């Protein structure tokens, strides 16, 4: 146990009181990203060090590792606290997404340290998918680079609305205000191309020297704003799911005995209360909430993010992957959607390919109808492409094998997010953010099957009726 935790336990009157206080602190998930060697891992190490989250044995080990692998001379190489893979330490870069946890008196934090290299875009997208805020590091000597633009675009694409632009290594430019202001203006000019209403803040700092990270800098009197830690402790994160209508994807049908039948899952958005009329999709059958069951007892009301089991008044057919919504919700199941795809496989994504896809617990099959364009994520320009290569991002048309209930990703990341799974290897090969579900008539009117596909479909339906294959032309 480190000294600061021991002191907090003593101040709060024991372990139980301390644990209770920790449990009720708000949680902020954020990621650090930027160009290679901008100091992402060093910044996280500095946050852990200055908030006294490092144990004595870790600090001793860090001194030894700094002498062996360090790049900071006689100083502690704080990046070694989070660069855990041997390849990372030897190359001085981050490869994997490294998660770290720390807390202050005001808040708990989960940090995702993401790779800066372009070939690890898929790792960065994975880290960003669960975060509320992104820290974009910029080397004060280099300014806004292509990778800064790329990480900004990916962060906003994945729904992050709060961006903190940390202009690092200010010690190497003599803490110049003019340098800071120029980089700030350059980034604001670029940010006009990013989607959504963004909360962008700028902090000049030196992660290596600890300037403006957890304590104010003594060398930047011209900066009167908060430190980076102050920003993290006080930012008010508006989670989209709390303001959206009720969405409850069923993950598991809980039937421990003949007297109980409940539907377990995590409430994706909105709220639900006992007595509320709900509708099951895609069937459209309605019922009302009889009980909201949790491990700690029944609730009268539940909010987004809570893991609950819903018991309905009526016995109706519900299975894993079905979606419970408010009875007044007007949602129509669709068979097609346009999707922003981050491709994660060595083999390119191409029209005509089929994959298993998973959306909010529901697994089905989907076919790539076409690729509208690829986004050049360094310049945010769009261009036509026949195939989507590894680490590329593009807008793709998808056709599902069965009706799906979808939201756009910006409205609801749970019911608007999806993964592509290779049907042979069962490996996740892509991540998708639904931009727009397509109405049935739009999808049907734009479908263009080859003669071979139509002939094969007819043969399968004639000779293998037990497969229940759908008529591609829309017949019975």
Curated annotation (Swiss-Prot):
Enzyme class: transferase
Region feature G4, mapped onto this chain: 168-171
Region (G5): 206-208
CDD domains: CysN_ATPS (cd04166), CysN_NodQ_II (cd03695), CysN_NoDQ_III (cd04095)
GO terms under biological process: hydrogen sulfide biosynthetic process; sulfate assimilation
Gene3D superfamilies in the cross-refs: P-loop containing nucleotide triphosphate hydrolases (3.40.50.300), Translation factors (2.40.30.10)
Matching SUPFAM superfamilies: EF-Tu/eEF-1alpha/eIF2-gamma C-terminal domain (SSF50465), P-loop containing nucleoside triphosphate hydrolases (SSF52540), Translation proteins (SSF50447)
Sample GO molecular function, one term: GTPase activity
Catalytic activities: sulfate + ATP + H(+) = adenosine 5'-phosphosulfate + diphosphate
Region span, G2: 92-96
Domain tr-type G span(s) in chain numbering: 25-241
G3: region residues: 113-116
Pathway assigned to this chain's UniProt record: Sulfur metabolism; hydrogen sulfide biosynthesis; sulfite from sulfate: step 1/3
EC number annotated for this UniProt entry: 2.7.7.4
Region entry G1, spans: 34-41
Pfam families, per the entry: GTP-eEF1A_C, GTP_EFTU
Keywords associated with the record: ATP-binding, GTP-binding, Nucleotide-binding, Nucleotidyltransferase, Transferase
Stated family: Belongs to the TRAFAC class translation factor GTPase superfamily. Classic translation factor GTPase family. CysN/NodQ subfamily.
PANTHER family: TRANSLATION FACTOR
The protein's assembly and partners: Heterodimer composed of CysD, the smaller subunit, and CysN.
Functional note: With CysD forms the ATP sulfurylase (ATPS) that catalyzes the adenylation of sulfate producing adenosine 5'-phosphosulfate (APS) and diphosphate, the first enzymatic step in sulfur assimilation pathway. APS synthesis involves the formation of a high-energy phosphoric-sulfuric acid anhydride bond driven by GTP hydrolysis by CysN coupled to ATP hydrolysis by CysD.
Name the UniProt record assigns to this protein: Sulfate adenylyltransferase subunit 1
Upper taxonomic lineage: Bacteria, Pseudomonadati, Pseudomonadota, Gammaproteobacteria, Enterobacterales
